[in-house]
Amino acid sequence: RGFDEYFSIPYGSETAAPGHWEKGPGIELFRAVEQALGKREIIAEDLGYMSETVRQLVRDSGFPGMKVLEFAFDSRDTGSASDYLPHNYPVNSVAYTGTHDNETLVSWYQTITSAERALVRDYLCDYATPEAQLYKNMIALIFRSAAATCIIPMQDWLGLDNSARINKPSTVGENWRWRLKKSQLTPKLQKEICSITTRYGRMNWA
């Protein structure tokens, strides 16, 4: 959002009260970067509060936005309006089950409300898969979307809980400490990843 507008607080202020909004550099910054460096593969982190001017800036830039599956099943929403439901993903987007700042998919499903878990089941049309295996069907959801790119954290491929979470924003201590072990890269996992990426035409042989 800071590229569109940012909150300016005078130096020496004890609180943010004297601050005010300033216009950011906008699309001209990205045009200058492109002119200097050429086309670059940039993903717009368009999460959280989005004003219409920010949305327009993302559209003008042409950068793909982010679509996070874990944001899709808020029980306060109704119908299919959520931009984070996979059938609403545009081609020019990058789809994630979750990011480094989110819970793992397994723990997220365990911690949402029963109403939200019901929404997930309804959306999947799946009332039989054991909860411990449901993460695989949720990964398949975003692979079936129109998003040009899908990014699945290794913790979600492995079906791990929050003990493998990367980062919890605004906290200190155990963040950024999880490491993938060689022993976790099994032939079974390789076969599962190969199968789903091939099935949905997302195998990149380049």
Regions found by a protein language model. Name each.
Residues 1-206:
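Catalytic cores of glycan-processing enzymes that make or break glycosidic bonds
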